[in-house]
Amino acid sequence: MKTTVEKLSPTRVKLAISATPEDLKPHIDHAYGHIAEQVAIPGFRKGKVPPPIIDQRVGREAVLEHAVNDGMDGFYQAAVKETDIRPLGRPEADVKEWPGKDLTGDLLLEIEVDVRPEFDLPAYEGLELTVDSVEVTDDEVATELDSLRSRFGTLITVDRPAKTGDFVQIDLTATIAGNAVDTASGISYELGSGDLIDGIDEALESLTAGESTTFESKLLGGDNEGETAEIAVTVQSVKERELPEADDDFAQIASEFDTIDELRADLKVQVGKSKVFGQVTQARDQIVDKLLEGVEIPVPEKLVEDEVQRHLENENRLEDDVHRAEVKESSEKAFRQQLLLDVIAEKEELKVSQDELTQYLIQGAQQYNMEPNEFVQVLQQNNQIPAMVGEVARNKALAVVLDKAKVVDADGKVVDVTEFTQPVVRDADAPVEEPADADAEAVVADAPAEEAVAEEAPAEKPKKKAPAKKKAAEKAADSE
């Protein structure tokens, strides 16, 4: 097999592949075997039909097309490996020349595919990043202390109208067209939390125990989900939360500290860390924008257009040209950002350990309120585990750049970001490998090791353009 590469653009190439009859022979044999299993010919058992009879009854053209379809992906994968291109997206294949009916002559394929563009990585050591200045106020510390006190508060029944922050015990009845469709009794609800149906807070405000009222709202579940119903609510009791005194006794009960002053000091530190994390997030957002300003990264138009089309189809907004332009701009920036971080990860020789991938997957599962193994199974079914490895690697690349940057606030004060950038593992003890038959528990818990840097799109199977001939063979070719 011979392969040549023609560069069509910085992001697209054409592979010209010439496969000899010897290259195609294993696929010819497979085609005869497969067709023999599919056809029913009197006098022959399935799977036992000899090639000459298949040529006579089905046609040599059907065998050839079946063989080409069977071998095309292998030829493409070999060409990718031979030429060292880095494919992005789905390739498109065209059969330029078919072997003769006597199986002589080469098979000539032309395959176009988007590829990762080459670009000069901008310098990222010593980037200067300016973030907002922050300070911790006494009011913020007091708010944190009150939040902690509320965890140790007690509920006291009160004889007065309910107000925001009170806990009420209520009974609910939903009615549609005069028919009760749902009821609930003895529900404990914190007024103002917004955890129940719309309108409940306004309805309960100023009601006392034993009083009732009605209001309209859309139902959030059940057989009548989404329908508007009349909601009757009765207050059974009103309770307020009584907070413990903020003194040394409370500090000893609620924390590791002996005095309330020590507890307040620790809360101030925690609030400060939270604000520094906000500064770090701000710095991370600046990093990519600053780096992208210093480099021109070509974007594969077809890859982006396909992504835009999928996005608009999912939103059912194909005719919205303004939104299309917005999505295209966002997709192009996301591609450049991803590629930039991929190259940094490769330059820094970053690898993703199994523990790092596991933690990332667990966080993703929590975000979607799923069990980790269930979350991983969904990712595996959609072949998304490699993408997750890539995301972890990009996060590590960001951390490396941030670690090398100089971050100051608006007042010129240096911001210490080391807590959020160290350690960055380069030579991971157990780099990730995603075996083809790995189960969910293996991915979450204990996968084998392999180098894993930033995600690279796998060399997908070529999407073959309709051939100019061989139409009579389509049924046999599609029966695989």
Swiss-Prot record:
Lineage: superkingdom: Bacteria
Compositionally biased tracts (Basic and acidic residues): 471-480
UniProt-annotated location(s): Cytoplasm
Alphabetical keyword list: Cell cycle, Cell division, Chaperone, Cytoplasm, Isomerase, Rotamase
UniProt key word Cytoplasm: yes
Domain (PPIase FKBP-type) ranges: 165-244
GO biological process: 'de novo' cotranslational protein folding; cell division; chaperone-mediated protein folding; protein transport; protein unfolding
Sequence segments annotated as region (Disordered): 447-480
Domain notes: Consists of 3 domains; the N-terminus binds the ribosome, the middle domain has PPIase activity, while the C-terminus has intrinsic chaperone activity on its own.
Protein purpose: Involved in protein export. Acts as a chaperone by maintaining the newly synthesized protein in an open conformation. Functions as a peptidyl-prolyl cis-trans isomerase.
The protein's name: Trigger factor
The species this protein was found in: Clavibacter sepedonicus (Clavibacter michiganensis subsp. sepedonicus)
Source organism phylogeny: Bacteria, Bacillati, Actinomycetota, Actinomycetes, Micrococcales
